[in-house]
Amino acid sequence: MLPTPSTSHVNFDNVYEPAEDSFLLIDTLSSPTEATFLTDRFSCRCSSPVLLEVGTGSGVVLGFATSWAKKIFGRRDILAFGTDVNRIACKATAQTARTTIAASDAPDESFSAIWGDTIMADLTTCIRPGEVDILIFNPPYVPTEDLPELSEGEYASEFERDSHLLALSYAGGDEGMETTNRLLDELPNILSLKRGVAYVLLCAQNKPKDVKARIRFWEGGWHAETVGDLGKKGGWEKLQIIRIWQDP
């Protein structure tokens, strides 16, 4: 079992703390089934794959995938990036990734990818079309009446700022799917043609069966399957990871 990155440097008053959803993503990516799928998919002598995590939070998932790239993807020349609307989370992710890479690399063997940066952005708005080969998304999936505004604006207090930043990490609006639907709408344009693959976390109230059925109707022959399942309640809701991809 590969070690999980340390996030002891992160202030969880204003950054999403790793929980069951984070660890389910880590377990899924490093599972023998997915490691084999990803290694086979990126085994060709092609350009270096680009890895992007959208909504990095503490950086525990991206740090894990970056530091153990050779074991997960079968190659080290992965270019790893992240985005988050929370500038504090962006800084935390960069530190998590750098620290984890340094800890995982041994003098005689290195498993880590090439660390790029974390960019403060709304989902994939800063990414050029067709550039992402592996996308990871742990969205704000909790059903809520409203979505918090993306703009940080002016805060009356530090508590108000922290509450707003944390709300951005969990509040998903109607059926918990408003932010996820925006990301799904972008996927066919953002992922690299025929090579791109996405891992998206959903909870039962997001209606994953309906989500997968909708993806399968996308033009271009898209697939969507559950590849990771907590198998029990994750906090207050059952969680699963769906893989989204096209045949090469």
Language model features with spans:
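SAM-dependent Rossmann-like transferase core, predominantly class I methyltransferases
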Residues: 1-73, 83-92, 125-128, 226-248
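Mobile active-site "lid"/loop adjacent to the S-adenosyl-L-methionine
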Residues: 136-179
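A short glycine-rich, Lys/Arg-flanked "PGG" loop and its adjoining helix->strand segment in the class I
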Residues: 156, 160, 181-194
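Short beta-strand element of Class I
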Residues: 78-81
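S-adenosyl-L-methionine
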Residues: 91-130
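Short alpha-helix
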Residues: 180-184, 205-216
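Conserved beta-strand signature within the Rossmann-like core of class I S-adenosyl-L-methionine
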Residues: 195-201
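Local beta-strand N-terminus motif with an aromatic residue
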Residues: 48, 131-132, 195
